[in-house]
Amino acid sequence: MLQPKRRKYRKEQKGRNTGKATRGNAVSFGEFGLKAIGRGRLTARQIEAARRAMTRHIKRGGRIWIRIFPDKPISQKPAEVRMGNGKGNPEYYVAEIQPGKMLYEMDGVTEELAREAFRLAAAKLPLKTAFIVRQLGA
């Protein structure tokens, strides 16, 4: 599963996910892309589940790029622990997703195969997404 190798600090503040994606919002590597329309968080498990769904559908053909990385730790306190006594331990990592962010890209497959693979992947994600075809000159 995806997670950072090292972090300067183990825990991070919650923060707010605002605005639109200004970087990583175009198809850069492949021919087709899956773009986030909504905003939210994707856990490392969700990113991996979507990748597996796509990989299984396209079988041996094509190449997939994951354009997001879960680098924000989310901490949780154990069950039935009283409030106070500090912040909980990091349990998992998430990627903060803004509208317009390119999530996955694909190349080396037909458009209908890519469309179906992205549809299967989108079913694993808690965000609204759109299928994007690379524009000429972009």
Curated annotation (Swiss-Prot):
HAMAP family the UniProt entry points to: Ribosomal_uL16 (MF_01342)
GO CC terms: cytosolic large ribosomal subunit
Protein function: Binds 23S rRNA and is also seen to make contacts with the A and possibly P site tRNAs.
Protein name: Large ribosomal subunit protein uL16
Positions with biased composition (Basic residues): 1-13
Alphabetized CDD domains for the sequence: Ribosomal_L16_L10e
PROSITE patterns, alphabetized: RIBOSOMAL_L16_1
Sequence segments annotated as region (Disordered): 1-24
Gene this protein is translated from: rplP
Residues making up the signal peptide according to the UniProt record: none
Family stated for the protein in its record: Belongs to the universal ribosomal protein uL16 family.
Gene Ontology molecular function: rRNA binding; structural constituent of ribosome; tRNA binding
Keyword Ribonucleoprotein attached: yes
Subunit structure comment from the entry: Part of the 50S ribosomal subunit.
Superkingdom as given in the UniProt entry: Bacteria
Disulfide bonds: none
GO biological process: translation
Sorted UniProt keywords: Ribonucleoprotein, Ribosomal protein, RNA-binding, rRNA-binding, tRNA-binding
